[in-house]
A protein has these predicted regions:
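Sec-dependent signal peptide hydrophobic core
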Residues: 10-18
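Conserved long hydrophobic alpha-helices within structured protein cores
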Residues: 14, 41-47, 115-117
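N-terminal segment immediately downstream of the Sec signal-peptide cleavage site
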Residues: 41-67
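Extracellular low-complexity Ser/Thr/Asn/Gly-rich intrinsically disordered segments
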Residues: 3-4, 15, 64-65, 70-81, ...
């Protein structure tokens, strides 16, 4: 005769050990994935202040929307890549007859800490309506994106400075609601 009690106990112990092994593997994989998961640079919308120096005078406009889009990581550990900065309905100076949507593509980024990335660019031709404007090529773009990751509040921010052609420009914004 076959004694079921004899085989039941070792199988239960084996099933228990297998469950522990699967759990440990899952936790281990999750931790590794979290280490590589970097959401400092992601598609995000900011609202802030744009300042343009035109003919020696600063023109500042509040509530300007800048979207980060087209985020592409260039390495497997997701610490650097390119993104686009999209200025929405912006007038750089009061004399501009219409507001424009302007995209600055191919902005380089490098994640320097868990919650901060540096952005940079030089010689980037901005686009509006799909057309490039070489006379306003972006030079000297430097700045940073921060992601505080605090669930009680939103402290994500972006700040940068650049030149559109001969016009020094700066932007500082926080994550839009």
């Amino acid at each position: 005769m076959f004694n079921n009690k004899l085989f039941r106990r070792p199988l239960s112990a084996m099933a228990f050990m297998a469950a522990i092994l699967v759990s440990a593997t899952t936790i281990s994989c999750t931790k590794d994935d979290d280490d590589k998961d970097n959401d400092v640079v992601e598609a995000e919308t900011f609202s802030g202040k744009l300042t343009v120096n035109f003919k020696g005078s600063d023109f500042t406009t509040d509530n300007i929307t800048v979207r980060v889009s087209d985020v592409v990581f260039s390495n497997s550990d997701k610490t650097q890549g390119t993104l686009s900065l999209n200025f929405e309905k912006v007038k750089f100076v009061p004399q501009m007859p219409v507001s424009l949507d302007i995209t600055v593509p191919g902005v380089a980024f490098k994640i320097i800490s868990k919650n901060k990335a540096e952005i940079s660019g030089n010689g980037i031709v901005p686009l509006t309506g799909g057309k490039g404007y070489e006379m306003y090529a972006v030079t000297g773009l430097t700045g940073e994106i921060t992601d505080e990751n605090d669930s009680s509040r939103s402290d994500d921010s972006i700040s940068f400075s650049l030149k559109f052609g001969d016009y020094p420009t700066s932007y500082s914004g926080v994550e839009a609601d």
